[in-house]
């Protein structure tokens, strides 16, 4: 009788531990911190919704690729774009482009980060943009090209820095428009939580 009671108690304890562990272990969402010459901000990534995009972005982060790049395209009330050019407006060499993950349930709303690309839907490499307004017309369901832009995370702290960047004065430089007059430099991007 005592042995049956002990077995029942042990079984109940193990079941409780498994349920508690499952409930306490939500999907790991990495947090990445951007340090710029205008302040810092933190982005939470969505690897479940955009696994290829997040894996690609994290490879660039971990390799130090973004250090010394700039936000080269800034449009107030729309977005800030960076992650591919240096202060001389020269594009850095990138890895191969990735497949578009724009139909992942995430939308281009204020404070989200998405991959920049050319007119080819599967051309995203290192460049990204942060929406400073709700830009739902960039979602696959509403985009003029039927493809849209892949959101893969959101700013969870430091949005005031993003807004400050979005408010800088811009100019045309070479064949680029909307280039900040004073360079907005990404000093460092690092993983501060998750893998």
Question: Residue spans of the language-model regions?
Answer:
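Cyclophilin-like peptidyl-prolyl cis-trans isomerases
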Residues: 2-8, 16-195
């Amino acid at each position: 009788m005592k042995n049956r009671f002990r077995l029942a108690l042990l079984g109940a304890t193990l079941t409780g531990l498994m349920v508690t562990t499952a409930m306490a272990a939500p999907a790991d969402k990495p947090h990445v911190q951007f340090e710029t010459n205008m302040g810092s901000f933190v982005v939470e990534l969505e690897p479940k919704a955009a696994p290829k995009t997040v894996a690609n972005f994290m490879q660039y982060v971990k390799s130090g690729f973004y250090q010394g790049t700039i936000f080269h395209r800034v449009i107030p009330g729309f977005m800030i774009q960076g992650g591919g050019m240096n202060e001389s407006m020269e594009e850095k060499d990138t890895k191969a482009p990735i497949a578009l993950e724009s139909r992942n349930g995430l939308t281009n709303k204020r404070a989200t980060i998405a991959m920049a690309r050319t007119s080819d839907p599967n051309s995203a490499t290192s460049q990204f943009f942060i929406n400073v307004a709700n830009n739902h017309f960039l979602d696959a369901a509403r985009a003029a090209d039927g493809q849209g832009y892949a959101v893969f995370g959101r700013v969870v702290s430091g949005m005031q820095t993003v807004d400050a960047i979005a408010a800088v004065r811009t100019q045309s430089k070479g064949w680029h428009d909307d280039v900040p007059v004073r360079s907005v430099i990404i000093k460092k991007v690092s993983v501060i939580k998750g893998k």
